[in-house]
Amino acid sequence: QVIVINAPEKEGVATPTAEEILAIRDKVAASEVTAYEDNVVKEPLIAEGTVLKGSPVKKTVEDKQLGTTEWTLANGAKVVVKPTTFKADEVRLGVVGKGGLSLLSDEEYYMGEMMPAVNSMSGVGKFSATELKKQLSGKTASVQPSVENYTSAMGGVCSPKDIETMLQLLYLNFTQPRFNKDDVDNLTKMLLAQLANAKSNPDFLMQEKVADVTYGHNPRRQMISTEIVDKFDFEQLPGIYAKLYPGANGFVFTFVGNIDPETLKPLVEKYIGSIPAARKPINYVDDKAYPVKGEVTEEFTAPMQQPKVSVNYHFSGEMPYTLKNKMALTFLTQALNSRYLVSIREEKGGTYGVRVQGSTKYIPRETYSMTISFDTNEEMADELREIVMKEIEEIAANGPKSEDIEKHREFMLKSWKNSLEQNGAWMNYIQIKYGS
């Protein structure tokens, strides 16, 4: 018999002795353990007697190019349907509305950020997460809320035969979110334990510092900390959730997969149509949490078992949100990735790899950002930093190498062709059209 114990090696953490472990083993072996009996009784997800008033479709729009049908319901919900035959047993659901964490105060912000984890642990309606899993046994259907700085969302997936179950879960997530104090207390305990260990992780400390410096110590863009978790207030959670998901109007509900629109329509009218409308459609608020302007340099040290230097560059600014600019930034990041692979990894052997990532946004402003990061040793750090900037200046002056662009162009074309037969890709394309 082999017993394995894993525990962090740090001051204040007591590891049980061999004698204590064996005593626990002997106690369990001597106890009388009865077989587990699952006495779950299947119940309707939505309680019997619940009146679902529904809302009819009042407007229909066909998009021949995307192959979609758009319904606007009387309660203000917008529903987009894209039938496909890529996967016979898959229907995807995407729900997005503008708003997100921007609707919350600074004090509410991080509780809102943790809301998806709370939902996952607490269940929905009258069912705990464990009870819900049992109720859904034999079915393939799930719905999970998510939230970003400027959007509130939900995602779901089901088999075609279980689409009504998925819609019931969707209705419950909007109208009957569940908050259980024991579940939330367990979540906060888990977070505090993870954060206690993270404080000795130099990679976490680096991420924490980058977020703090990039956004000028803005309280809405910090890494989560023990101080933040200690301020979580269970009583505020229902009100915060209501701000994130106030009603059906302002949200776009997208279905992609093996669906028959005529079969789906009455179910949409029944369940999505029964989600109440908010007094005014959801929309985001510009919370002014922008990256700092100008050049800012920050250096710090942290204890580590294996010494290294981590370098992170963050470039950002305003840029018109156009397809041309998005493509240009994509090609720039790939050109830099190719150049750094040669000049830093292969020629200098200074790092396992340089990570270059770029993104564009149009909410709350039209902006771009690009990060360049790598790990190296102290002796080579300054030299590699010079190479990073030299490659950027070279592209700015003379443009990228044609072979780098052509290689990525071929990759993008191949990826795009493959994406045309993926439900997830079509979900993304449709949500981009509707401003998500």
Label for each model-derived stretch:
Residues 244-246:
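Conserved alpha/beta enzyme-core scaffolds, especially Rossmann-like or related mixed alpha/beta domains
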Residues 234:
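Phosphate-interacting basic helix/loop segments used at nucleotide- and nucleic-acid interfaces
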Residues 180-186, 281-282:
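Conserved short beta-strand edge segments in small beta-sheet-based binding/regulatory domains
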Residues 1-105, 252-254, 259-303, 307-316, ...:
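Proteolytic maturation boundary segments
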Residues 18-24, 109-112, 327-331, 389:
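Short intrinsically disordered coil segments
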Residues 1-8, 80-82, 87-176, 186-196, ...:
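M16 family metallopeptidases and their MPP-like homologs
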Residues 174, 272, 329-339, 387-395:
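Bilobed periplasmic-binding protein/Venus flytrap-like ligand-binding cleft at the lobe interface
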